[in-house]
Amino acid sequence: MKEAIVYTDGSYSGSTGKMGYGVHFEDGSGDLHGEIKNDSSGSRNVVGETAAVIIAVQTAIARGYTDIVIRYDYEGVEKWITGEWTCRKPISQQYRDKMHELMKQIGVTFEHVKAHKGNEGNNHADRLAKQGSGIK
């Protein structure tokens, strides 16, 4: 079993209107961040949050991991998958469907962490997401 532990986060800049994502791989295998372009869902940071999780899982699969632990601070990324939250908007429906597809290829465990409470892995993912959305 080869397990990845990742922290994911999303960000939205009100001044630029850009959305970003950040993914921190705890093992140092390479962090990811970027801007999400052309989103018209109006969901702002949620787009970044869900993109971060999908990109983390896709990257873990590509890197040969068999399992991934996703540490997140936005509850929707887990609760839409478990059905605790109803997927009312297209963004959450698309996220749920994509994750169910990806979860056939890799074991996924979700762990909630509190935002901005001194967790260095989460803080690092937050900084990456802000870079992606153009926040300095």
Where are these regions (language model features)?
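RNase H catalytic domain
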Residues: 8-17, 54-124, 128, 133-135
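Loop-to-helix element that buttresses phosphate recognition and phosphoryl-transfer chemistry
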Residues: 48-52
